[in-house]
């Protein structure tokens, strides 16, 4: 049976069976004065905490479904604490034969606290997530395409979290380690070994790796286009 379509409107949000949409999001934004900060910048730690708190504040508005909100929370933690985005980006833009072993080793060994903080990209990412959580009425004054832009952001974020949830499921139930997908990015590294030389377990991973590789490659290109770090 289809659940009833009920919409509740308050001064700050619009609540539907699927989403809680923010109407005013000024308190979730950051000052625009920040620039890129390197590892030695005294402001770096403060800015990281500011961004992290604002992303986490948006969790209740991502979805009314607990599983989706939990996936968003885990993904934000991963992005801030573990992900080596520069390594991931390097693997996407450099085919197997063009990769430098020295460059790969350097990127792989760079600690999270030693990386440049891309403040501009993080600000745009925060704006993207805000759009996905924000309600914009389609009126004569407000152009339809601007309101539709928020919907696109919401749909993209939903797809991203769905794929991330599938990664978590694969780690838990399909014998694929966390390090393979989210640390080493094994799914982005093409293997030069013939299928006949792979063992049974490795062969089973190939179809799933292809799905994750295609998605993450598309996501990197989307980030390059939008200037974000989704």
Swiss-Prot record:
Belongs to the IRC19 family. It comes from the Eukaryota. InterPro entries: Irc19. Keywords: Sporulation. The lineage of its organism: Eukaryota, Fungi, Dikarya, Ascomycota, Saccharomycotina. It comes from Saccharomyces cerevisiae (strain YJM789) (Baker's yeast). Involved in sporulation and maintenance of the mitochondrial DNA. Is probably involved in a pathway contributing to genomic integrity. This is Increased recombination centers protein 19. One of its GO terms (biological process) is ascospore formation.
């Amino acid at each position: 049976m289809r659940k009833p379509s009920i919409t509740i409107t308050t001064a700050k949000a619009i609540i539907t069976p699927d989403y809680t949409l923010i109407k005013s999001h000024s308190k979730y934004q950051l000052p625009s004065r920040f620039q890129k900060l390197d590892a030695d910048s005294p402001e770096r730690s403060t800015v990281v905490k500011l961004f992290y708190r604002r992303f986490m504040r948006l969790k209740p508005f991502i979805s009314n479904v607990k599983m989706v909100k939990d996936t968003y929370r885990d993904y934000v933690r991963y992005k801030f604490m573990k992900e080596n985005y520069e390594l991931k980006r390097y693997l996407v833009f450099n085919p197997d034969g063009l990769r430098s072993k020295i460059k790969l080793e350097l990127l792989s060994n760079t600690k999270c606290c030693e990386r440049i903080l891309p403040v501009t990209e993080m600000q745009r990412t925060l704006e993207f997530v805000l759009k996905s959580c924000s309600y914009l009425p389609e009126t004569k004054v407000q152009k339809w395409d601007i309101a539709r832009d928020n919907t696109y952001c919401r749909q993209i974020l939903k797809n991203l979290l769905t794929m991330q949830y599938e990664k978590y499921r694969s780690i838990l139930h399909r014998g694929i380690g966390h390090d393979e997908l989210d640390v080493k990015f094994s799914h982005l590294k093409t293997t030069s070994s013939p299928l006949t030389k792979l063992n049974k377990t490795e062969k089973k991973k190939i179809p799933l790796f292809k799905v994750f590789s295609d998605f993450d490659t598309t996501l990197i290109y989307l980030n390059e286009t939008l200037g974000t770090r989704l």
